[in-house]
Amino acid sequence: MAKKILVVDDEPDARKYLVVLLEDNGYETDVAVDGDEAMSKVHKFKPDLVTLDIIMPNETGQKFYRELVKDTEFAKVPVIICSGVTRYKELFARSHKTMPKPFAFIEKPIDQEELLKKVKEAIG
């Protein structure tokens, strides 16, 4: 059975790119456009991994991440943060000192090999 990945990004082109890349490599995907939708999808789709943009309308990636790691059912789901804003890696780390760190940070534009390597490290 294919491992499941939830792609959370407000940019349609980024979502499509990630979905095609991941599905072409044997993963099952679902998408969410913001943190609100992502939390709902997590409970329905039960992903093995989440790729997460930080800057999104409605609920940000940071707020979604806080909710995810506090949810006992999904706290151990690896999260790969994909952001085009480099400084958010440091800001994110500083503002979440008491929380588990995301599995990885990947800068946009996303390098296919780097992302696939991190996904395989996280879930096989």
Role assignments for model-derived ranges:
Residues 31-40, 61:
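Helix N-cap/capping motif at the beta->alpha junctions
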